[in-house]
């Protein structure tokens, strides 16, 4: 029987003086492959939250009318007309995709895994990876993307993008309604278009690009299923555990060479079968990732200026 791999990162946990950033850095360095699951907690750590001033300053009229608690509740609301639906969604997409700046934790993570075998699955639908200029062949958007549109009747498997129309909707809307003629229409059946995001009842349109992303992700998992794999879960809650949390735990259990690492202030239940191969990091996600990059002795010794450029980007 093959002996399971030894992880120095697990040993570091035994030392109370060890910083969490060092544990993260060590695990990334020693992994043969890294499967990264990213949820809303990572974008929120960069300040891209769905609550507070970011919500109240951009949607005061919707809050007054519907008493919404946050943007998530507002985005799931069954609006009475397509004019109102697109009045909200056009503002939401502009804020959370078209105009959302680059996140510092995404830049730092990209540098941390540079040169490693890695693949990302994300339940986020914002622009974070595009803004940070990731190689998108390593990213799988399992929940869709805000900028994409699909037929509301799901009459065909194709998504569409029209940035200019979204911006025009924001400018033209009045009293929480866009002009009737601006409602995007399906080119096949003429039904109104909607945002390409997964719904519990009907799912979402999964086009050729979606399936290409899925195929690349599955191929990576299969290629490294027995390797020394770090299953790194960042900012994932329990809203949709079937996409990241449960598969990561299951793959860790099946591969004795793997460890499961979660970055989350909340402590969710860990199956008994993998508790001894689980690392739970509780510090602020953005701070933890950027600190791990700064503490990378190789990066600091070889190219200090490049590291500082990554962490200081604001475009």
From Swiss-Prot:
Keywords: Glycosyltransferase, Metal-binding, NAD, Nucleotidyltransferase, Transferase, Zinc. NAD(+) binds at residues 40, 123-126, 143, 238-240, 264, 268, 285. Changing residue 124 to A: Loss of catalytic activity. Its EC number is 2.4.2.-. Its cofactor is Zn(2+). One of its GO terms (molecular function) is metal ion binding. The keyword Glycosyltransferase applies. The keyword Metal-binding applies. Is inhibited by Tenovin-6 in vitro, but not by nicotinamide. Disulfide bonds: none annotated. Binds 1 zinc ion per subunit. Residues 13-299 form the Deacetylase sirtuin-type domain. The SirTM-mediated ADP-ribosylation can be specifically reversed by the Macro domain-containing protein encoded by the same operon (SAV0325). Catalyzes specifically the mono-ADP-ribosylation of GcvH-L (SAV0324). This activity is dependent on prior lipoylation of the target protein. May be involved in the modulation of the response to host-derived oxidative stress. In contrast to other sirtuin classes, lacks protein deacylase activity, being unable to catalyze delipoylation, debiotinylation, deacetylation and desuccinylation of proteins. Belongs to the sirtuin family. Class M subfamily. This is Protein ADP-ribosyltransferase. It comes from Staphylococcus aureus (strain Mu50 / ATCC 700699).
């Amino acid at each position: 029987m093959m002996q399971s791999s030894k992880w120095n990162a697990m040993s570091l946990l035994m030392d109370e003086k060890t910083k969490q950033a060092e544990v993260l850095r060590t695990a990334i360095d020693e992994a043969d492959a890294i499967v990264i699951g990213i949820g809303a907690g990572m974008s929120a750590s960069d300040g891209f939250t769905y609550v507070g001033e970011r919500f109240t300053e951009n949607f005061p009229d919707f809050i007054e009318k519907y008493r919404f608690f946050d943007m998530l509740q507002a985005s799931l609301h069954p609006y009475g007309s397509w004019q109102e639906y697109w009045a909200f969604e056009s503002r939401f997409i502009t804020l959370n995709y078209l105009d959302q700046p680059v996140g510092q934790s995404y830049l730092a993570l990209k540098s941390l895994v540079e040169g490693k075998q890695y693949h990302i699955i994300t339940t986020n639908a914002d622009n974070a990876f595009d803004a940070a200029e990731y190689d998108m062949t390593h990213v799988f958007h399992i929940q869709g993307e805000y900028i994409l549109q699909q037929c509301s009747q799901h009459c065909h498997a194709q998504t569409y993008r029209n940035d200019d129309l979204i911006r025009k909707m924001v400018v033209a809307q009045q009293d929480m309604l866009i002009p009737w003629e601006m409602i995007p229409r399906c080119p096949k059946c003429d039904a109104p278009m909607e945002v390409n995001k997964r719904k519990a009842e009907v799912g979402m349109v999964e086009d050729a690009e979606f399936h290409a992303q899925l195929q690349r992700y599955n191929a990576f998992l299969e290629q490294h299923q027995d390797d020394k794999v770090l299953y790194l879960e960042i900012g994932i809650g329990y809203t949709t555990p079937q996409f990241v949390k449960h598969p990561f735990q299951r793959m860790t259990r099946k591969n004795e060479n793997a460890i499961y690492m979660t970055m989350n202030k909340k402590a969710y239940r860990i199956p008994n079968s993998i508790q001894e191969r689980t690392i739970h990091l509780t510090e602020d996600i953005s701070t933890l990732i950027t600190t791990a990059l700064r503490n990378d002795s190789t990066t600091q010794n070889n190219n200090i200026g490049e590291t500082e450029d990554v962490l200081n980007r604001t475009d």
